[in-house]
Every structure is written in C-alpha cells, then in structure tokens.
Amino acid sequence: MRRSLAPSQRLGVRIKSKDAFTPPLLKKNKRACQQELEKRQSALRDATNIVELPLPIRFTANSEYEQAIAKVLARKFKVPIANYVPDYGGNRSLGVRRSIVRRALHDPLACNALVLFTPPVYTEHERMSLDPSKLQVHVVVDPLLSNVLRPHQREGVRFMYECVEGKRGSFNGCIMADEMGLGKTLQCVTLTWTLLRQSADCKPTISKAIVVSPSSLVKNWEKEFTKWLHGRMHCLAMEGGSKEETTRTLEQFAMNTSTRCGTPVLLISYETFRLYAHILCKTEVGMVICDEGHRLKNSDNLTYQALMGLKTKRRVLLSGTPIQNDLTEYFSLVNFVNPEMLGTATDFKRNFENAILRGQNADSTDTERERALLKTQELIGLVNQCIIRRTNQILTKYLPVKFEMVVCAKLTAVQLQIYTNFLKSDQVCRSLADCNEKTSLTALSDITTLKKLCNHPDLIYEKLAAREKGFENSQNVLPANYKPKDINPELSGKFMLLDFMLAAIRANSDDKVVLISNYTQTLDLFEQLARKRKYSYVRLDGTMTIKKRSKVVDRFNDPSSDCFLFMLSSKAGGCGLNLIGANRLFMFDPDWNPANDEQAMARVWRDGQKKPCYIYRLVASGSIEEKILQRQTHKKSLSSTIIDNNESVEKHFTRDDLKDLFSFEANVLSDTHNKLKCKRCFQDVQRQPPADNTDCTSHLSQWFHCSNNRGLPDTILSQAWTASKCVSFVFHHRSQAEAKPAATTTDEDEELSDSKRKAKKTLASDDDDDEDFVLNCSSGEEFSGF
C-alpha cells in the first residue's frame, strides 16, 4: 500500500517551487535548529513558574443594566431559610457520625423470634426526660439460630441467658444438666453468639469466651460453631502444637482486649488449660463454658483450682450425666458456677450436709428426719435457681424409635470350667480372707480377670500359659488346636452371639454397627474377627490423636462410605462423639458406673439419626457381669458403688460385697431376673406385659422379659438366638409407642409448627428410686430425694 506524505513531513526533499510553503526550521542548519528548540523549552519552563491571579470582574460600561448584573454577582450567597443561622462547626471535628436511633439488632416482632430481654415500656413524657443514649433495646437471638432451635432448646437458651446476666438472682452462673442428645452444644453456641453480638445497651455483652472440654471434643466444638453460624465467626481451637507455639497463641488471645476480637472464642482441653492457666488467668474473660463438667466435682484437683482462678463471673457447666447425691461433690459443682451461693465448704457442711445425712440414718429420730426434710427443701430452693435438667424423653418427638435390649449370653463350656475353677481356688479364698472393710489390690485384680474371662479366654491367655495362681490347671481346658492370636468365637458365648448377629446384619441390611468395650484387648479381638469375616472397620481408642479422631468419625458417618464397623473404647470416646452413621450398637461389657454406659450407648440415638436404633447390652449369664448390672439397675447408694475411675475402688467393697461378686449362679436363665422377683412372670415366662406408660428409661422390672425368641422386636437377634443357641434371657423395651420420622434441627417448618402447637414447657422428670438421690432440676420443676 502506497503512503503519501504531506509537504511538511517530507524533510529530505527539496521543494523547487517558489510558491510552495516552507517551514522556518527547514531554512536553517542542524545547529540552528537545536538552539531554537532549547530556547523554546527554556521559555516553557519559565512560564510554568508564573502564577497568574484571576482578574476581578470589571465592567467598563456605565449602563444601569451592567450595574444591576454586577450587584447580583457581588452579593454573598444566603441560605433561603427563614431565620437560618449558619453553623460553621467550629467546635466539631470533621467526620463525626451523626447520632442514630437505638434499636435491637434483630426484629423482636419477626416470626419465630426468640426475645431474651424486653426493655421497660416508657410513656412519651418519660421518654423525653430520659437520656436517649441510655435507652435499652430488645435482645433477640439471631434468626439464623432461632429458626432451628427446638422448644426445649429455646427454653434452655433463655434460662442460661437469664442466669449469666443476673436476671434470676445475685449470681451469674448456671448448670445445664440436660441428658445426652438434647442439644446442649447448640444452646451454648446460641448463648455465646448472642452475648458476643448484642446487649440491652446496644453493644456486645462480652468480647471473649472460653470453652473448656475433653481433648477429644475440641474439634467437635469447632465444627459445631462453624455448622450453626455458617462461618460468621472464627474460633481458636488449641489442638496439638509445640509449647512455644501454644504459649505465643494464648498470649495473643489474652492480650487482645478489643470489643471486636478476630477470634473471640477459645476452644481448649482441660489438660491444656491446666498447663497454661498462668497465661489465661491474667486477662478478663466474658464467659467460660465447661463441657463434661462432672470432671470438676473434686474441688481439690488442679484443674478445678486453675479454672476457679479465671477472671470471669459468667460460668456455665454442662453435664449430661445425672448429678448424684454425693453432697460434697455437688457442692463443688454449684460453688464453681456460683461461688458463695451455698457459702463456704464449712458453712455448707454445717448448714446442710450434716443435717441431711443424719436424717438418712436408719436410727435417726423423728426430729432429725424432720430437720433433714426442711434442710433439703431449703437446698432445693437455692439450687433450682441455677440448674436446668431435661431427660431425653423429649427426643421421642424428633427421633426414630429406639429398641434397647439386655441380652444374657451363656458361658461356653471352656469359659465355665475356667471360671468355676478360679472361684474354687486358694487365690480367691485368700482375697476374701485378706479383706476386712477394704478391698485388697489382689481382689481388684481378680475381679478384672473374671470380667475379661466373660469376654473371651484369649484375654487371660497369658495367665493361663504362666499357670498363675488360680489357673494352675486351666490351660488343659483349652482345645488342642487353640491358637491365641487366631480368634475363635466358639470359645465365648458373647463372641459367638456377636459373630452370628454381625453376619445377619451384613447379609440382610445396609445398617452400620458400633462395637464398644472397656478394654482395648477386646477391641483387638474385634479386629481379628473383622479381618476373618472381611468386614471393613475403623477403630478409635486412647492411642489415636485428636485430629485423626475427627477424620475417622467423618469417614464412618459418610453415607457413601462402605465402613461397616466402628470399634470404640468407652474410656477414650464414650463422651460427645456423634456416630449417627450407625443405627446398631453393642455394649460388649458393663461398667461399674452406669453413667459411663449411658454416655457410650447414646452415640447413635442422636440428632440427625434417620433409622430405627437397636442397642444391645451383652452380659454373661450368672457371672460377675450380672452382679455389675444389678448394681446399676438397683442404683445403690454411692457408698457401695463405683462412680468413676478417678476414685479408689477399695472403699466401696465390703467383704459381703466380694462374696457376692465371687459367686456364680449356675443353671439360671438370668440371675438378675431371679433377684427382681418379678410378679409379671411365672416360671420365667412373662404373663403380663409392662404398663403402657413405661419405656426403656424405666426400671428393668418394668421391661419386657423373654425366655425365648418369641416377641422380640428385632428379627436379627431372634435369628441369632436360634442359630447360636447361646442366649438364655432378654430384657427389652422401646423409647416410644411407634416409630416417627426423624427430624433434624434444620427442619424449620416442623419447628415453627411445633412451637405454635405447643407453647407450654416440656419438662420430664427422672424415674429414679427413692434411695438414688439424683437431682432432677429444671426451671419449672423441683427435684426431690436427698
């Protein structure tokens, strides 16, 4: 393409025409052009330094028109408002926000709104005399949470808020004693989020909070905050890390005193808190929540003392286990949340404990019993202000039906021979002879040995092989082809029953199963059985790290996972775990403390469960396991039962107790049923069903009693009874009359309809014996039974 240039652009071409335009620069040489260019640039630089002031408007004409225009333009601007006085802001800094109307953070009149505080109503005259900056507003729970709270949870949030804000008395602490599965975590998340965001004074009530829990639940708390708040708040979860990292992180949390903290909630375990209490106790904290708070029943331990040193007045204690009638422990719990509410320990003993205990004695006088009753009522009146308790009977409206069964399995011939030989040995005789009022360590070891033998002979094979005292000739009882590391279910009645039931479940359903034991050695046998039958499984015990526990639980609960078995140590994961991926649970051996068993068995029948649940408690017929079950069932006083593994066992067993434990009831279907002296059964056959108002929380005497597989609610157990021929007796009951569709807490429609349908409080009381002095407290119901 040809390009044409203008004449001025063609510098290298001589223009011959005289009439043509010639630029001035073309007539000069190169040096002259450069000088001309520098001259022009210098003039331009000088011109930029000159500031020319605008000339005033001048009118040269003298006409009236020009004068009128000049007068208008010279006049100053005036705001066209009558009597307007301009305010030039001489006393006000630039950028100050104008005062705004004080209002609640959320609409108190919205549908399903949960209002925790309602300000007093003022007349217009009273409002004019009040300072507008001090008018109180409504405190309304975030609709994100109020729309998923069930009626009993709304009541619990309101109760805790009134306690921590001092609305129920001159105290700021409370005990949330709801049973497992009622959503204590969600209620605490709601309370914490509300206090961090608002108050009646239009500002946050607290700036920081600490949640202290067992180490296995720290990650679970973080997940719950994220789940319910949808990531609107970040928590500081202390999981692992070096000492230097932990110290630096906690110091940063402690030094942050701003009202809008980036991570306002610290999630920490009891052990970590105790180690770093010197850092956390330096700063003020808005509120502390203690999960599994029954750990604080001993006021002398270091963890209790460390938490008491925390600078906070708002204390919330969570405990899913019933508060039992050890008055000293009970005082420790109440004194932690509300110091001085019951006075000092000496005052409490003088004012309440001594009088109540004297009234319980069999030889107490009428005056002492009357005084004990008065003191009990006085104590009830005090503690009911700060304790709320509801039973899991409330869950029957939201969860599928739960079938609970106590299965008595016969010992095999091998187990029976070893068991009876040991009871007849000199070892047991010496244990009984050495026992006066306290149990010897030898007797405790013998008790553990018998419990392990009831599970499987493999668990005591080392004693058999070493021919220890009591087992001198027992190794000869084992089969000739016996191999200790190769599981043989036929050597144990409970394992044989478990093997049959797992096979039937695997073949006939897509159900998942949780296996729980108090011994990790039993978990080893579970693993051997799973590998032998080619079942996929996961295992959680005390050796697993906290981070890995969360991954294992998530994998098992995943509906797409093919994991069939979840093996769990009750000591490591009996509290707080949510295993709703399974709907069948085997409690393979009983614990001395019924609360531990209840915690472990509550892992599957929880919020989010959509299938009917089957809970199996296996005990060896006539053995020491039935003795343990009887202690749980009859709920004897704490002087003759073991409450937890932190207490020494020897103070609980007398010589008569040991004689009962070291006895075996042969040729009985169930020693427990015999001792119940059941009037509804004749010759071990039930003639009359339980009352209609009973369920699986009732006493065993009010359950269904089966000496054969007819009438069992579970076809799997019925088939296994016939196939294994090792079941002798079954107690069973259900949670409610009929199964109902499961409803999760995110089902907003059901929550709305339920709240409209029922406006009254839903409270349930414990169905305890008179001699089991369990506190059954709620905001609307007093407990009784000291």
From Swiss-Prot:
<feature type="domain" description="Helicase ATP-binding">
    <location>
        <begin position="165"/>
        <end position="340"/>
    </location>
</feature>
<dbReference type="GO" id="GO:0030716">
    <property type="term" value="P:oocyte fate determination"/>
</dbReference>
<feature type="modified residue" description="Phosphothreonine">
    <location>
        <position position="22"/>
    </location>
</feature>
<feature type="short sequence motif" description="DEGH box">
    <location>
        <begin position="291"/>
        <end position="294"/>
    </location>
</feature>
<dbReference type="InterPro" id="IPR014001">
    <property type="entry name" value="Helicase_ATP-bd"/>
</dbReference>
<keyword id="KW-0131">Cell cycle</keyword>
<dbReference type="GO" id="GO:0043150">
    <property type="term" value="P:DNA synthesis involved in double-strand break repair via homologous recombination"/>
</dbReference>
<dbReference type="GO" id="GO:0004386">
    <property type="term" value="F:helicase activity"/>
</dbReference>
<keyword id="KW-0597">Phosphoprotein</keyword>
<dbReference type="GO" id="GO:0005524">
    <property type="term" value="F:ATP binding"/>
</dbReference>
<comment type="function">
    <text>Involved in mitotic DNA repair and meiotic recombination. Functions in the recombinational DNA repair pathway. Essential for interhomolog gene conversion (GC), but may have a less important role in intersister GC than spn-A/Rad51. In the presence of DNA, spn-A/Rad51 enhances the ATPase activity of okr/Rad54.</text>
</comment>
<keyword id="KW-0234">DNA repair</keyword>
<dbReference type="GO" id="GO:0016887">
    <property type="term" value="F:ATP hydrolysis activity"/>
</dbReference>
<keyword id="KW-0498">Mitosis</keyword>
<dbReference type="InterPro" id="IPR050496">
    <property type="entry name" value="SNF2_RAD54_helicase_repair"/>
</dbReference>
<comment type="similarity">
    <text>Belongs to the SNF2/RAD54 helicase family.</text>
</comment>
<feature type="compositionally biased region" description="Polar residues">
    <location>
        <begin position="776"/>
        <end position="786"/>
    </location>
</feature>
<dbReference type="GO" id="GO:0015616">
    <property type="term" value="F:DNA translocase activity"/>
</dbReference>
<dbReference type="GO" id="GO:0048477">
    <property type="term" value="P:oogenesis"/>
</dbReference>
<dbReference type="InterPro" id="IPR001650">
    <property type="entry name" value="Helicase_C-like"/>
</dbReference>
<keyword id="KW-0469">Meiosis</keyword>
<feature type="region of interest" description="Disordered">
    <location>
        <begin position="738"/>
        <end position="786"/>
    </location>
</feature>
<dbReference type="InterPro" id="IPR049730">
    <property type="entry name" value="SNF2/RAD54-like_C"/>
</dbReference>
<dbReference type="GO" id="GO:0003677">
    <property type="term" value="F:DNA binding"/>
</dbReference>
<keyword id="KW-0227">DNA damage</keyword>
<dbReference type="InterPro" id="IPR000330">
    <property type="entry name" value="SNF2_N"/>
</dbReference>
<dbReference type="Pfam" id="PF00176">
    <property type="entry name" value="SNF2-rel_dom"/>
</dbReference>
<dbReference type="GO" id="GO:0000724">
    <property type="term" value="P:double-strand break repair via homologous recombination"/>
</dbReference>
<dbReference type="Pfam" id="PF08658">
    <property type="entry name" value="Rad54_N"/>
</dbReference>
<dbReference type="GO" id="GO:0140658">
    <property type="term" value="F:ATP-dependent chromatin remodeler activity"/>
</dbReference>
<dbReference type="GO" id="GO:0006338">
    <property type="term" value="P:chromatin remodeling"/>
</dbReference>
<dbReference type="GO" id="GO:0000711">
    <property type="term" value="P:meiotic DNA repair synthesis"/>
</dbReference>
<keyword id="KW-0238">DNA-binding</keyword>
<keyword id="KW-0067">ATP-binding</keyword>
<feature type="binding site">
    <location>
        <begin position="178"/>
        <end position="185"/>
    </location>
    <ligand>
        <name>ATP</name>
    </ligand>
</feature>
<dbReference type="InterPro" id="IPR027417">
    <property type="entry name" value="P-loop_NTPase"/>
</dbReference>
<comment type="subunit">
    <text>Interacts (via N-terminus) with spn-A/Rad51.</text>
</comment>
<dbReference type="GO" id="GO:0045003">
    <property type="term" value="P:double-strand break repair via synthesis-dependent strand annealing"/>
</dbReference>
<keyword id="KW-0132">Cell division</keyword>
<dbReference type="GO" id="GO:0010212">
    <property type="term" value="P:response to ionizing radiation"/>
</dbReference>
<dbReference type="InterPro" id="IPR038718">
    <property type="entry name" value="SNF2-like_sf"/>
</dbReference>
<dbReference type="GO" id="GO:0005634">
    <property type="term" value="C:nucleus"/>
</dbReference>
